[in-house]
Amino acid sequence: MEKDLTKGNPLGLILRFAIPMFIGNCFQQLYNMVDTVIVGRFVGDRALAAVGSVGTIFFLVVGASNGMAIGFTILTSQRFGAGDADGTRRSVANGILLSACTALVMSLISLSLMRPLLAAMHTPAEILGDAYAYISVICGGLACTLFYNLMASLLRAVGNSRVPLYFLIFSSCLNVGLDLTFILCFHLGTRGAALATVLSQGVSALLCIIYIYGKVPVLRPEASMFRPDPAFSREQLRSALPMALIYAITASGTIIMQSAVNLFGAVAVAGYTAASKIHMLLTQGYFSLGQAMSAYAGQNFGGGDFARIRKGVGAAVLILAAYTVLSFTLSNTLLPVLLPFFFDPGTDLSLFSGWAETYIRINTAFYIFLGTIFVFRSVIQGVGRAGTALAVGFAELTGRIFMARASMRAGSYRMAASADGAAWLCGALTALFLYFLVMRGLEKGAGEKKGDQSAWQDPDRDRN
């Protein structure tokens, strides 16, 4: 069911819209975590380190494709908010064509550059083969990931966050079954874990397509619309490319951070990998809130209601503050509970726990800044200023590179673990500044336009 985010109480609307996405994103992280857990327990701690060592590349490739998919649907959200059904359907058709081209190009480029990149990241020799086997399958199956993200984003653009959740839950369960089948029955190791992820996301994409064509007519383009539209392409790429670049910029910094962690050896990489999976689970609330704010801002921008956007931001800040307290509390209980699941029962956890605890404890202190980035950057993107939001990514990159390089010089894992926090602090300050700058410019422009229209409609006003 489509949801109009231009009417009703912003706090309640954003919460009801974000919660299904939060559950879905948690499931997505859980089935990524299941890959890691099954690999660690049934293949070994070296295989666990191998999967973890390419986590930043996974984020780069999959994150960039996700950014493209979300960017393609910002125009859909705006057209839907403006009540333009024909424009909504045309944006869907053009987004599908652009996504197909994106998947092909990104798969070819990533596969051709993978081995040199792994070498440049100082990937330990004993895990290099397993690392390449895993990430090459992920990159080769990028079309499945991109089209799932596109279809789910299209549904969210019209206010439907529940259906993608249902399909994702099914896909998560399928992923677990395929993981066990490929690893235990066919002995495919890390390659099998990646194959399970790709196939599961492909099933989710297919289910979303079937649902859209059967139940959501506003997103169902006519066959004649599947022709490249230069005007729509320019508008969609103007949003999508900066969003993909934001992921790429962020991932570039995390690749440098991963390179710093790799210098401490396979044991440190395994401990860091387990901690980073728990961290990703804890931070899904921020990511989901950002997704909700992008759709909320997009619809209200399409409707021309800037005051309502500001009210929504105020509501999002309240949600952000409450979730930060919750995630900080959970971090102290989840780590000792979940850490043993990543390793074989006979493994001496004391070898890995110190590395994991250091990363989690440092980063939870900076979660408030991470949440700030997601809220304010998403609003900037939702109002069609994705290019401006690139500055947030560059600020994060600067903070992350500075701290990662400092850790390499000092030989300090604690400094390497602080690189994310430094990035979030820099990014949050930049996002806040840009939000106020963008909103002031939009409101000023809207006021001037309204004044011009009033003058045109009242030619006798100067006589009085």
Describe the function of each predicted region.
Residues 48-108, 145-164, 271-335, 370-392, ...:
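Small-residue-rich hydrophobic transmembrane alpha-helices
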Residues 21, 25, 37, 74, ...:
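Transmembrane alpha-helix boundary and packing residues in multipass membrane permease domains
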Residues 69, 138-156, 164-172, 193-206, ...:
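Short runs within selected transmembrane alpha-helices of multi-pass transporters and secretion channels
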Residues 5-43, 56-71, 75, 100-107, ...:
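N-terminal transmembrane alpha-helices
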Residues 1-18, 76-141, 185-241, 297-365, ...:
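Short alpha-helical transmembrane segments in multi-pass integral membrane proteins
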Residues 16-35, 137, 148, 171, ...:
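Transmembrane helical elements of multi-pass membrane transporters/channels
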Residues 30-48, 118-125, 181-188, 248-281, ...:
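Helix-terminus/linker motif at the lipid-water interface of multi-pass membrane proteins
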